[in-house]
């Protein structure tokens, strides 16, 4: 019994790594909730319709993912060089934090979207290095548990600044400020939270797995990318997993990124939407921990397909979503599987790649994850514009989950 307890006791470095998830998840939650409302207010002031608002928001998200897809493998490969990972990670965090603050200074919708792209690219870039740090902060037989705890505490920890921000926005009139001013303050609060929770990791992290510094490090990083891509097909498990991940996580991230925009386009009550998404975070906390524990009894190759199938059901349900209570049901079910599919995918990948090339491989992982989500957002945006129905746009994501499920089963047999 004591040995089992010791096995799951977090080290100081593991706690610092998890704490960064608590910080950046606050930004993710803000992007999924208050930031779309801020943009909606600016869009209405600029004369955009609800369909145009949803479409432009989707196009901005797509721009972020294309930029991330271009930068991730380059930065990830460079970060595998000794003593490069932490400085580049720090730079990306700084870009995200500064961008988060700067969004509050925009007064029209177009500058706001441009700054949002800037901040989201910094955030996405930081995740390439953060995810690749997993092989440095823990050992393979603890990866599923540590990764799950990262997502779990990220979900519940992000609620702390969010509740403060939500109370500030909803109660703006009672404290004598406008709602737009309250939204500005919410952005500053979130940026400060993100920065403070990053500091322990910056103090404690040391790169363990690396390649030695060579002359012309940037040129060598491009050469290593080419070598990895040429030989990727030889590692069938990694190759087919990345193809599967490209599809299913694209749908997951699109649902996360566009949930509030989707509900707003359907005319749902704003307060109800925000509270429903808060419930998603709360439900995701114990659910991610449960999946972490289940990973000790069942392989991730069994648990991940269960999560993919659940998301296919979520997309199907979105076709018929019309009422506020249905959005609440959707929020709860998403929370049940969101943390599991993200955490298990990250740890599953970390276990099947060479640890000394974690940055390089996680650069590819990020392309197939955050960098590939342009496809999902484009499906939603184009589908909404062509049919005039947000339900059809979001429901069409079921195709990504079906294809992802099939490809994952192929990868798990390699």
Indicate where each model-derived feature is located.
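A membrane-interface helix-boundary motif in multi-pass transporters
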Residues: 50-52, 169-192, 382-401
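Juxtamembrane intracellular "pre-TM" segments in multi-pass secondary transporters
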Residues: 2-14, 206-242
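Helix-to-loop junctions at the C-terminal end of transmembrane segments
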Residues: 70-84, 286-300, 384
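Structural signature of the two symmetry-related core transmembrane helices
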Residues: 87-102, 302-317
